[in-house]
Amino acid sequence: MVNHKNVKKMIKAIAKRTLINKMRKSKTRTAIRKLVDIIKSGNKENVTPAFRSAESNLHKCVSKGVIHKNTAARKISRLNAKVKALMTA
């Protein structure tokens, strides 16, 4: 058991931050999944807003320190390539 007040506070703060980070990651994964589903269906009208949403969520995760910037850049690049392939097809 912890003996210091600040340790108890930090445990609560870490648990809260972990929950928020999980929510952000989940929201981002959902946006990416929706974009991939739209790409697979071949719907060209809805692909741009879905891509913007996924890209925005990834950038927010980077700015909040949830994921690394290179990871986000790689995912955005791969999603963008899929979107371009759909638009040119």
Curated annotation (Swiss-Prot):
GO CC annotation: cytosol; small ribosomal subunit
Pfam families listed in its UniProt record: Ribosomal_S20p
Origin organism lineage: Bacteria, Pseudomonadati, Pseudomonadota, Alphaproteobacteria, Rickettsiales
Biological role: Binds directly to 16S ribosomal RNA.
Alphabetical list of InterPro entries matching this protein: Ribosomal_bS20, Ribosomal_bS20_sf
Species this chain originates from: Wolbachia sp. subsp. Brugia malayi (strain TRS)
Record has rRNA-binding as a keyword: yes
Family: Belongs to the bacterial ribosomal protein bS20 family.
GO terms of biological process kind: translation
Protein keywords: Ribonucleoprotein, Ribosomal protein, RNA-binding, rRNA-binding
A molecular function GO annotation: small ribosomal subunit rRNA binding
Protein name, entry field: Small ribosomal subunit protein bS20
